[in-house]
Amino acid sequence: MNLKKLLTSAVLSISLCQSAFAAPVEIDKVIGIVNQGVILKSEVDTIVNRVKKQAEEQSQELPKDETLRVQAVERLVNQTLMMQMAERMGLEISDSQLDQTLASMAKEQGGSIADLRRTIEGSGESFQAYREEIRKEITTQQVMRANVDRRVYVSEQEVDNLLKIMESQGQNAEEYDIGHILIDIPSDASADEIASAKTRADKVIELLNDEQEFKRIAISSSSGSQALEGGQLGWMGINEMPSLFAEAVKGKKQGAIIGPLRSGAGFHIIKVQDVRGRQVVETTETRSRHILIKPSIILSEEKARSMLAGFVKDLRADKADFAKLAKEYSEDPGSALKGGEYDWADPTSYVPAFRDTLLSLKQNEISEPFRSQFGWHIVQLLDTRVADKTEQAKRNRAHGMLFNRKFKEESFNWQQEMREQAHVEIFPIDE
């Protein structure tokens, strides 16, 4: 018996049991199967309602609900695949780690978690559901980082070449606010399928040239990861964009429609929504130290977390020395011999779980145990400073630009490969 029949039988059995008492009422409905998991109609409705509410607040025109539901289903398929990957990796986001992330989010808005709760509940959304959605977002980010990072390599020669380009650009470098629409093509597409996709891409450009609203067209037509956000990629410099985009965007004026640009993923359409001079932003660097414990067959998740919790208790009571504990117990070979210490670095270079925890700390404060894709950590913030403009800082920035460019390209390839290897069935949603 396949999964769809099994689910149908289960729903039918419940209905028959209830029929002796009252007419059955449909509480929810399975609208998709992703490997051994399911997508529920209620999950689709939640995303659609959130997009519609945001559009209403911004006075933005949206396509029909049917189109929004298709995009919501696509997002849930990708999210489900990554959550399944997280389960296979043994990756879980603890409540304490989630609370630290929520505290950082609330702090950015000038408030506390209690203030954030009031805002969420004031919008008509359950705070518990919001917490779980953030937990999923953190999880999928860490899954992607763990799987895509190892596919990205930046050579010293590439860094040298980019530094020369940046030097020649001087202060004249520009940043572009980019909108993006992807008309995707399957990896094994036939000539007819490619021609059909090209025709659709040309039609989209035609609509945009007629000054149709970009976000609405992106939501209704794009297969890109930001489709439900209206295809908004945000501000980026030429050196931060995927190579295909950079060559086409350079020198374009505000309002320019570019494309279709062909890649292995499909046909890309870009709109230059605005142009500005590069914003010089001073970044804050941190110096920190940490201890990493990796769960294993011998050491369970709970024992690893409990072990670090004991370290934290002793450290706060001045009964232990951080450097000695790191040298003896930490399983991060790069820092253990140095007493767990990380030299000055931009915290955004760390994985999200580590970054968010570090940024939530005060100087010399030690965190509670938290989980990343590498294992369980505790971290202490030793000091902060405004990044200097040394040659090494420039080199680090160039490396970061190249890494981010390649990461964006590879993350799409990885998601496409994962989707093609999965068993996905989508059923009609009857309204």
Swiss-Prot record:
GO terms for molecular function: peptide binding; peptidyl-prolyl cis-trans isomerase activity; unfolded protein binding. It catalyses: [protein]-peptidylproline (omega=180) = [protein]-peptidylproline (omega=0). One of its GO terms (biological process) is protein stabilization. Gene3D superfamilies: 3.10.50.40, Porin chaperone SurA, peptide-binding domain (1.10.4030.10). Residues 1-22 form the signal peptide. Residues 173-274, 283-383 form the PpiC domain. Its EC number is 5.2.1.8. One of its GO terms (cellular component) is outer membrane-bounded periplasmic space. Coiled coil: none annotated. Its main location: periplasm. It is found in: Periplasm. Chaperone involved in the correct folding and assembly of outer membrane proteins. Recognizes specific patterns of aromatic residues and the orientation of their side chains, which are found more frequently in integral outer membrane proteins. May act in both early periplasmic and late outer membrane-associated steps of protein maturation. The PPIase activity resides only in the second parvulin domain. The N-terminal region and the C-terminal tail are necessary and sufficient for the chaperone activity of SurA. The PPIase activity is dispensable for SurA to function as a chaperone. The N-terminal region and the C-terminal tail are also required for porin recognition. NCBIfam families: PRK10770.1. This is Chaperone SurA. It comes from Pseudoalteromonas translucida (strain TAC 125). The gene is surA.
